[in-house]
Amino acid sequence: MLERLNFIENKYEELSNKISDPSVMANQKEWQKLCKEHADLEIIVNTYREYKKAQEDLESDKEMLKEESDKELREMAQEEIKELTLKLEDLERELTILLLPKDPNDDKDVFIEIRAGAGGEEAALFASNLLRMYTRYAERKNWKVETMSLNATDIGGFKEVTVAIKGKGAYSRLKYESGVHRVQRVPDTESSGRIHTSTATVAVLPEVDDVDININANDLRIDVYRASGHGGQCVNTTDSAVRITHLPTGLVVTCQDEKSQLKNKEKAMKVLKARLFEAAEAERAASIAEDRKSQVGTGDRSERIRTYNYPQGRITDHRIGLTLYKLETFLDGDIDEVIEALVTEDQAEKMKDLGRVN
């Protein structure tokens, strides 16, 4: 590990020199790429330097303990040695985590697709609850939320809705939300007070650049039609809504949120690229580790990941067996406690994998 950390520190110094070079700064695209690489290494280098300083201090205290005869000074040195030993253990764990393979999509913006599952109108209302939860979470993070497409019901639910969430680290936090979310509650329309179970499916897709995926224009069928609102009524007198079908895969994306046909097409293409990228990534991951299923979950949208129980005020994440009794604040976007637990479990799984490889 130390050999790798020394290499990273040297690389960081090289990048520091490059990004301050006027000739490199003249090429803005290359300069921004180097700045990002420099920023990605900074936390590792700073932690490593703190680790080396603690090691030096520890050796110094050990030397002093050998030579010092004063009782009080020896006691101080022994106490410092204990503290520094614990600090080094913590820093070593932190460095191990920092050196884990990073998901290349972690820094990307995301699309979140929410679809009502089993449960009819109640499932559609739950889909709207989930949309609000992610919107409130994004607000807490100062991320931007943009509606891409929606299919609303007459009573305020969503058969399906897609939003873009833009902000630093959006995918790294939200990627754990892919899967089936289950709600248990008494619907407003239920006169007998029986608890119903409904579901909604969430898919979290990283937004991809043109360089990440290439789409042949001949593989697309693009249809335009008039946008409709709640209950199907027409809300636009022009054919501004867009439906794009990717013929080789059968994937269909619609967008009618904008008044401009061109803007709707641009939005739909972004979502289509994200879906195709996700499909390619899933196929690649399956070929690399066909039988491996992380305890954190596969990210498969068919996997049941969480239950929201209203009568008990309970949320249970089934992937890690975590139960919290804070349903109201959770649905108001206070979801970091669960996400942190999922991140920790994911890191533990990756460390196990590294141990098996090594």
Swiss-Prot record:
Keywords: Cytoplasm, Methylation, Protein biosynthesis. Transmembrane segments: none annotated. It is found in: Cytoplasm. One of its GO terms (cellular component) is cytoplasm. Pfam families: PCRF, RF-1. Peptide chain release factor 1 directs the termination of translation in response to the peptide chain termination codons UAG and UAA. This is Peptide chain release factor 1.
